[in-house]
C-alpha cells in the first residue's frame, strides 16, 4: 500500500516572510506549534486552524500559515492517546541556521527552534532525528536517510527552516552554501537549493505524513 500523501504546512503565505525570533526566542510559527501540541486530543481538523490563528497573533499579522494538501486523517493528534500507544512515530528536525556567504550568517531563532521542536516531538513519543546540514549535499543525504527510515513507521513529521524563497510557484529551502550573490534564477535554484516538495517527499510513513516549513517564501 502506498504511503498517504504528505500535508505541507507553511509558516507564511506565498510571497510572505517569517520572523527568526519572537519573545520566546524562535519563529512565532514554532512557538504556536509547540504550545498547541500540548492541548489534549487536539485533532488535526482543529489543530491546523488554531495554528494559523495563533501564528498570525504571535507574528502581529506578518505570518499567515497555509496548508498544501489537507491531511486525509484529520483525527490524528500530537498527544499520545490510549489508542495511539502502539503507534510508531518518527520525526526529522532539519535546520539550516548558518550561511557561508552572508554578512549576518547565523539564524539564531532557527538554531533555538531545532532544540525546542525536537524536545516537543520527543515528548509526544517521536523518535527524533536532528540534522543541521552545512551544505546541499549533506541536506540531501539527511533526506534520503529519513525517507528510508520513515517507511517503517506509522507517523512521519518533518520540521524544517532556514532561509527560503519562492520562485515560479515553488518554495525552496536555501542550504548553507547557497551562492546568494548570484541571485535566484531557475537554473541556480535547481542546482543549489532544495524544493520544499523534495523535503516533504521524505515522509513515507504508513498512516500520517506531515511537513512543517517555517522559512520565508519571498518572491524572486
What are these regions (language model features)?
Residues 1-220:
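Cysteine endopeptidase catalytic domains of the caspase/legumain-like
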